[in-house]
């Protein structure tokens, strides 16, 4: 199973620390973390990361690039962390949560 975790915040705080600890301790699952380039260096080096530039809720080009990246990875699950990340992913996937 392949799982993509998304963290699009600008600072490394509670959610990001939780994701860091979660991904270090997950076994037998192929996990990839997509995160903001400004916080990528704070995650443990054992975590497979893809850094992206900051994406705003209204950034059409940023959303397009994120959707293309997720489609290229072809995960079984996309796990969002944080309300901003969830709203961005929901807006690029009109079939989410139905």
Predicted regions and their residues:
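Active-site proximal beta-strand in glycosyltransferases
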Residues: 3, 94-98
């Amino acid at each position: 199973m392949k799982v993509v975790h998304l963290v699009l915040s600008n600072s490394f705080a509670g959610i990001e620390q939780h994701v860091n600890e979660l991904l270090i301790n997950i076994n037998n699952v192929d996990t990839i973390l997509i995160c903001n380039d400004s916080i990528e260096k704070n995650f443990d080096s054992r975590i497979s990361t893809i850094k992206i530039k900051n994406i705003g809720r209204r950034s059409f080009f940023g959303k397009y690039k994120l959707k293309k990246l997720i489609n290229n990875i072809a995960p079984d699950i996309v796990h969002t962390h944080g309300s901003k990340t969830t709203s961005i992913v929901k807006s690029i996937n009109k079939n989410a949560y139905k």
